[in-house]
Amino acid sequence: MLYLTKIRNAESEFTGNEQKIADFLRANVSELKSVSSRKMAKQLGISQSSIVKFAQKLGAQGFTELRMALIGEYSASREKTNATALHLHSSITSDDSLEVIARKLNREKELALEQTCALFDYARLQKIIEVISKAPFIQITGLGGSALVGRDLSFKLMKIGYRVTCEADTHVQATVSQALKKGDVQIAISYSGSKKEIVLCAEAARKQGATVIAITSLTDSPLRRLAHYTLDTVSGETEWRSSSMSTRTAQNSVTDLLFVGLVQLNDVESLKMIERSSELTQRLK
């Protein structure tokens, strides 16, 4: 039996740490060549022995055997797909009907939500919400699809009284970053965590004494190393994709949770502002 199938079949029996390992392996199967058990343990906040025991539970002698088998399964799957049809997005091919495409997209998004939520450290999330709530000024940075997620969050935070900026222009993002002060917060959204523009802004913000919060993947990256706090997102999208669909879904689940957490922290005043905002926009109709 294929290891990916074994992981899926045994999921109901996994402990908390085992579920973290399973989620990581499935989300990063295309990048496992560069992942060691030591690096993985550090990113997940668990011991290396937990990873070895997980591999043995699935029938492998150790993590190396499991990793190589998963790489082989992924490569074989790619070759099979490429031989029969054009690869349109993630697991979707040109041979798929619209019904099949809909099912695949829905499942991809469901997995992104399930796996991202499974990784939440709620004590750390509460701390991040408190840090944001006390910030005199908040800058949100992102590129492409991540910028859209950031813009949505900025609108939500403005609605409940926060001073926020989320500029699309990277030069403006950099300019704002260097003007941040101690106590200010920069929320950097980047799934790869390696975009030069976002990393540059995070470096500038940190240098100025601002708190950097990264919404990024589990993969080790320059942004992850720079951030004071990280909020992990998981996406089942393969290296080849036509658009960041499930990635945006995962990122939105994090930003929506931040927003609701901030509303809850100051519920009476926040709800008053939301109601006033609704009343004003109704008058524009």
Curated annotation (Swiss-Prot):
Q: Which residues form the signal peptide?
A: none
Instruction: Report the residue ranges that make up the HTH rpiR-type domain in this protein.
Output: 1-77
Q: Which GO molecular function annotations are given, in alphabetical order?
A: carbohydrate derivative binding; DNA binding; DNA-binding transcription factor activity
Query: Which parts of this chain does the entry mark as a DNA-binding region?
Result: 37-56
CDD domains from the UniProt entry: SIS_RpiR
Transcription regulation listed as a keyword: yes
PROSITE patterns, alphabetically? HTH_RPIR (PS51071), SIS (PS51464)
Spell out the InterPro entries in the cross-references: Homeodomain-like_sf, HTH_RpiR, RpiR-like, RpiR-like_SIS, SIS_dom, SIS_dom_sf, Tscrpt_reg_HTH_MurR, WH-like_DNA-bd_sf
* Keywords attached to this entry: Carbohydrate metabolism, DNA-binding, Repressor, Transcription, Transcription regulation
Q: Name one GO biological process term.
A: N-acetylmuramic acid catabolic process
Q: Which domain of life is it from?
A: Bacteria
Q: Which PANTHER family match?
A: GLUCOKINASE (PTHR30514), HTH-TYPE TRANSCRIPTIONAL REGULATOR MURR (PTHR30514:SF17)
The record's note on quaternary structure and interaction partners says: Homotetramer.
Identification of the protein by name: HTH-type transcriptional regulator MurR
